[in-house]
Amino acid sequence: MPGRGIRSFMALCTAGAVACLLSAGLAANAQDREIKVGYMKNPIQDASLDMMEKWAKGHNVKLTRVPMAYSVFMEKVTATLTSGADQFDIIWHNDDWGQLWKKWLDTTDDIKGIDNADQWPLLAFWNDDRKLTVVPMAHTVGTFFYRSDLLRPEEVPTTFAQLVSISQRLQKEGKVKWGYVGGMSMNNTWFSLWWTMWANNCDILKPLFERDNAKLAAARFEPAVTEPCHREIVEFWWDAINTHKISPPGMTAYGRNEANAIFMAGDAAFTLVDSTHFGEFNDPKRSKIVGKVGMAPFPIGPRANKPTSWNEIWGWAIPKGVPAGRAKLAKEMLSGMMTDDAGQIEMWKKTGGPPPNIKLWPKLAAEDKDFAALKHAVFDQTPITHSAYYFAEWPAVHKAYSDMAIAALSGKREDIPKVLAEHVDNIQRAATGN
């Protein structure tokens, strides 16, 4: 009996050990079949994730979404990247911080379908070895929106002067409270100051429109903010708010959400924001102007003779700290997204996010009047430059610029040249890291 008891005990121990090993192996395998995505909660990112989810379900992969607020996203993900942790297998990527993250990201040249992406918006995402570090999610393009129930296409303003006069007419007729509303606060500069800056043949640094970092450095990152072309756009917005009163007096503090809310309430005739908000404007639960929104090229300033545009992307990236097995799986999932034509078309219809596969654009333009309008407003226009700079100190430059612009718009009109000049050194120091 004692001998049989010992043998039985040893057999149980062996069986238990085997079971533990099998369980550990299954757990490890299950972990390897899970992909965690860190992203900003946003309809277009959710639509892109829906395509990945479809692929994941068909390949026995668990997709875990980890949403974060925009205000904490960059800081949190940067900390993860620099520590080499594998908290996320895929992360949302943006041209604003493309150069900041390039050395911590896996390359994506081997993603299936990447050759169907537009090359222009990829400038921010090449690493020092000239390897790509992004997979496009959707194009984020500045789009001039107007109330199509108030204006026929041929009546839409094509110049800054017409934007003022038509806004005032619509206000006088009692059709809108405001002519133009757009974001203007830090991180929303594109939707007022910057689109008009580029539309007036101007830029932030010299040489104008240059994005080659070596050439910018050779020019000592000299600000262009005291140039007449730049002073004119600050004066334009001062007048829009204080003299012509076509824009709200509090607009210097508006982000895109505040501006969008006014536009969707039917209180403004015009706005400019990323096309990805087109879906919001046509959401009956949020908007009073469903089916009443048109798109047109940017109105131009006195120094320009044709419209410009900006055409950038949101994307996905894979951190270098991700174990090889999961990185391979992440690439397969992103390949599935890039080759899902039906999913990309559905993303456009639901959110207004133009597909990353540009070979779909002609078909969409032929079949969808809204995409045809967007194509005319943005993709048929030639961008004068990229809508950001791609050196590591760019976020600091953006902040210094925003401080300058808000200070100038908050003071007296006659003081604008002085305020711009006073901030030149701050912008230059931000650019050089001093």
Where are these regions (language model features)?
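Extracytoplasmic "Venus flytrap"/periplasmic binding protein-like
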Residues: R33, K54-W120, T133, D149-T158, ...
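C-terminal lobe and pocket-closing loops
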Residues: Q99, D274-K288, G301-D403, A431-G433
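C-terminal segment of classical bacterial N-terminal signal peptides
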Residues: A19-A28
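Conserved C-terminal helix/tail region of periplasmic/extracytoplasmic solute-binding proteins
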Residues: R33-E34, K57-G58, K62, K172, ...
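Short, polar/charged alpha-helical segment
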Residues: K41-K62, V234, Y401
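Glycine-centered hinge/linker elements that transmit conformational signals in sensory
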Residues: S167, R211-M251
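Extracytoplasmic/periplasmic substrate-binding proteins
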Residues: M51, E232-R326
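Hinge/lid segment of periplasmic solute-binding proteins
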Residues: N94-G142, T158, Q162-I166, S192, ...
